[in-house]
Design a protein with these regions (language model features):
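C-terminal regulatory/interaction module of P-loop NTP-utilizing enzymes
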Residues: 1-283
Length: 283
């Protein structure tokens, strides 16, 4: 298939993820991406655009975001103010129509990639309010009495953190993929992209420690890929040797610069207790 997505030089994609992206493109369906925080959901859309050489548009959703904002907004307040000031711009209502992210993507002269990020942050009706526009690739502007149609159907990537369940009618129109947290082999590839000259011994010890922390039972917040990369950056900057990460020193229950990985005191104490018990039982 021409123009297949195969990942990029800075985004390691699994075979499953590549297949999902390419399937969504073939079907002309939005690609709904779920997964743990830090698994590259948001970055994916940008990398698809880079790989396929397409323009990129992004719409980051907040709890207050309404579907209409993605289409357009009519600035009635500015028009009223300009009318009172005798501004000639008021004669053309188009001067007060603010294009949204969907409109900008629909206007693209070549097929774009559109990211709708964290759709589950909005209210429960938000996905349903976009059904018609995403299905038909058009919407009506009441103020100007015109229909805006997409010049090219965008490649749409929608991310969700599972904060809310999405409506069935919306899900039926999507191709779904869950990004699993990277295993050691995939994580090694990811780290290599960011730190190509990292010594193998330090990489091995860092990954061993990282996954040991993630596997700690009862951990409130597991460290993510981005936090691992931050930690490795600090290890390199501080010239921390690999042997420090595997030290059996009873006074060093947690790894150096742990603040990049453990983000609350409960998790710090929990990990300290687990390491202490494991070392005591090993004697």
């Amino acid at each position: 298939m021409a123009n297949e997505f195969r990942g990029t030089d800075r985004y390691i994609a699994t075979e499953e993820l590549m297949a999902a992206v390419n399937a969504a493109v073939v079907l002309s369906r939005p690609l709904l991406i779920k997964g743990e925080p830090g698994t590259g959901k948001t970055l994916l859309a940008n990398e698809i655009a880079r790989a396929l050489d397409k323009p990129f548009f992004e719409w980051h959703i907040k709890s207050t975001t309404k579907a209409q904002q993605g289409l357009y907004e009519y600035d009635a307040v500015s028009r009223l103010r300009d009318s009172q000031l005798g501004d000639a711009r008021v004669k053309d209502i188009r001067n007060y129509i603010l294009k949204g992210n969907l409109w900008e993507a629909f206007d693209s002269d070549v097929q774009p990639v559109l990211l709708i990020d964290e759709i589950d942050k909005a209210d429960i009706e938000f996905p349903n309010d976009l059904l018609r526009e995403l299905d038909r690739m058009e919407f009506y502007v009441y103020e100007t009495r015109e229909t805006v149609r997409a010049k090219h159907r965008p490649v749409i990537v929608i991310t969700s953190n599972n904060e809310k369940e999405l409506p069935d009618a919306f899900l039926r129109r999507c191709f779904f993929h869950y990004i699993r947290f990277p295993d050691t082999a995939t994580m090694t590839q990811i780290v290599d992209v960011h730190f190509p000259e990292l010594k193998r011994e330090l990489l091995h010890e860092a990954l061993t420690t990282f996954f040991k922390i993630r596997e700690t039972p009862g951990l409130k917040k597991k460290p993510t890929t981005s936090e691992l990369l931050d930690w490795i950056k600090l290890l390199v900057a501080e010239e921390i040797p690999p042997e420090v990460l595997r030290s059996d020193d009873a006074k060093k229950l947690i790894p150096p610069l742990y603040g990049a990985l453990l983000k609350n005191e409960q998790d710090v104490h929990l990990f300290e207790q687990l390491v202490f018990l494991n070392r005591r039982n090993a004697r």
